[in-house]
Amino acid sequence: MTMSSKAADYSSFWALGDLAVFKQMMKAFSPSLRYFACSIVGNEAEAEEVVADVFIKIWQQRAQVTPPDNVQYYLFKAVKNTALNYLKQNGRRQTHLAAWEVEVSHHHAQNPEDILINKEQLDHIQAAIQSLPPRCRQIFILVKEEGFSYEQAATLLDLSKATVNVQMTIALKKIWAALGPTLKYSYS
């Protein structure tokens, strides 16, 4: 799901505490937020707990919080901070070498490009993304799958925009290198 498709109007939640809109927001963002939290805390169960804590806190403090301009960015930043606090409270340091135990399937509407890419190629692409170093993979997913700008990803991860740019270059080179034999075979 791209940033524009996620940027639904959640103002009635922030203004009125609309439970239905809150549930819609949770449903729309939870899979991506769990995936992101898992990249920080290192396992699915803790990631689920972190995301639940964020949504509980948002619900409890809805009347006191100013509605954010960018709900997606706000939620990712809240998950990042909650995950880091979770690690600190549990006597663990953040590790970017943690294995991601969860795969979140992003439901994309089919378009002509999706139809042309067969299942085997999608498996190769997913394997290439998963083989990236953890920080590089995290940046790639935020930018390419979640639709964050380089600047937003840099701010969210407390990195420079140049670092995000370098990591994206590395990610794309590694993915293309991994896919090279597959693409040559498929289209020759």
Regions found by a protein language model. Give the residues of each.
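Sigma70-family region 2
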Residues: 15, 55-70, 89-91
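Internal acidic/polar
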Residues: 3-6, 93-118
